[in-house]
Amino acid sequence: MTRKTRRLWIVIACLACVGSAAALTLRAFSSNIVFFMAPSQVKANPPSPDRTIRLGGMVMAGSLHRINENGTPVNAFEVTDGQAAVEVHYTGILPDLFREGQSVVALGTVQKDGGFTASEVLAKHDETYMPKEVADELKRTGKWDPRFGKAPDASSWDTMTAKKAGG
């Protein structure tokens, strides 16, 4: 075996090792990736029930109510992006800053009936905060254009959404 051939085999072996390591790393990370989806995306293309996602949008005014499922108190509310709404069921104490008309991100799974069961609910932390994913989705769907000022406040945004949903 010549020196050139030996060097070529060493390079090929190194590339194979690096490629294998990269493939194993990506495979390990892919099972931990949690995708962000807006309600309109969930309605149009529901993920499989075993897939955990982050659902983001605004809590519709008047949608928060407490129900009883199998003897357990559950918070039920609707999350909307202005185009569609998804009902969310969450067993647990809602964050102190959770309000109707405010942005929220819920971590959980979409059920076969189209509802969403959340294992965690995150609310905004002050009056100017909006999760980046929610702001990006509002911009993408045309609900908010930064050229025309800041994002709509919760009450006017929710009023716009209620008119669209009702009419």
Curated annotation (Swiss-Prot):
Bilayer disposition of the protein: Single-pass type II membrane protein
Q: Which residues lie on this side of the membrane: Cytoplasmic?
A: 1-7
Q: Which residues lie on this side of the membrane: Periplasmic?
A: 29-167
For the region Disordered, what residue ranges are annotated? 141-167
Keyword set, alphabetical order: Cell inner membrane, Cell membrane, Cytochrome c-type biogenesis, Heme, Iron, Membrane, Metal-binding, Signal-anchor, Transmembrane, Transmembrane helix
The entry assigns this protein to a family as follows: Belongs to the CcmE/CycJ family.
Q: What PANTHER family is this protein classified in?
A: CYTOCHROME C-TYPE BIOGENESIS PROTEIN CCME HOMOLOG, MITOCHONDRIAL (PTHR34128:SF2)
Name listed for the protein in its UniProt record: Cytochrome c-type biogenesis protein CcmE
What species is this protein from? Gluconobacter oxydans (strain 621H) (Gluconobacter suboxydans)
What gene name is listed for this protein? ccmE
